[in-house]
Amino acid sequence: MNETEKEHLKKVYTAYYSQIDFTKDFCEQNIKHITNIQKQPTYCNTPLFKFDGKTTALVYTLYSVSQICTDLLEHIENEIVRLSEVSEVEND
């Protein structure tokens, strides 16, 4: 691999890591926010134990977003490990 290719690859990795960091922060903030909301005694002025349509939909939506973010964070961690392994191989 010549120097131009290495520089290009470095820029690609830098941009990719930047996007990973942004996504990771976004997911962590969503999970934190959802956790705080779920600690509240009511959603939309409706007791959590009274599962009307609005409350039930909100609870499931928050759970779904939280689960998506958790899954995405796991994928990001795996991708970081994979990229570091690829980087080590290329540096050898």
What would you call each of these model-derived segments?
Residues 1-92:
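Sequence/structural signature of long amphipathic alpha-helices
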